[in-house]
Regions:
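Intrinsically disordered, low-complexity polar regions and short flexible loop motifs
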Residues: 1-183
Length: 183
């Protein structure tokens, strides 16, 4: 059932709807307040039940269902917008790739307030990344040439002893797994 107000005056209750036709099944991870994954595996056209969130300012990463690739990042300034005690709906809308969709509107997150009116666009934030360089310095003959993987995705093939990769971007503040296998 739809809500017009939060179940607690200190919270903002948020209903989430996935309405972006070219976006994959996604997770939403909150990265500023440490809330972690708040929406898990939501496909296009589905709703996630109400999230009863303490009214605060959040930073939301939209990730693929595996949680490894960040598609976009948005601010959700619930406290700044003084939304305590309210219930609202956040919709993912638009296209991740507008060029493949007749130049349609770009992907974004929008808030429908209980009072109605024009949807409120959540601000896009820069995706946090870290610069990583891989250096092969293992003198073991069995590891003279190796393949390097980042989160189960091939990163470097045929990587030789005493070589260094160029710097690459990796998710900042995230745990990731680096795998090494014989080439």
């Amino acid at each position: 059932m739809a809500r017009e107000s939060a179940t607690s005056g200190e919270n903002t209750d948020v209903l989430v709807a996935h309405g972006s036709t070219d976006a994959p099944v996604v997770d939403v991870k909150e990265v500023a307040a440490g809330a972690g994954t708040i929406v898990d595996d939501i496909p296009y056209s589905e709703f996630q039940g109400y999230l009863e969130l303490p009214t605060a300012d959040y930073s939301l990463q939209i990730r693929d269902a595996g949680g490894t690739n960040t598609v976009a990042q948005f601010g959700a300034p619930l406290e700044t917008l003084e939304l305590d005690g309210q219930a609202l709906t956040v919709v993912a809308s638009g296209f991740l790739n507008p060029d493949n969709n007749s130049g349609g509107p770009a992907f974004g997150l929008y808030v429908a307030l209980p009072s109605g009116g024009e949807l409120v666009e959540l601000p896009v934030e820069e995706i946090s990344t870290a610069r990583v360089q891989v250096i092969h310095n293992s003198a073991d003959a069995a590891a003279e040439t190796v393949d390097i993987w980042l989160n189960a995705t091939p990163l470097l093939d045929g990587f030789s002893f005493r070589t260094a990769s160029p710097f690459i971007d990796a998710p900042a503040g995230e745990e990731f797994t680096i795998g090494v296998a014989p080439a």
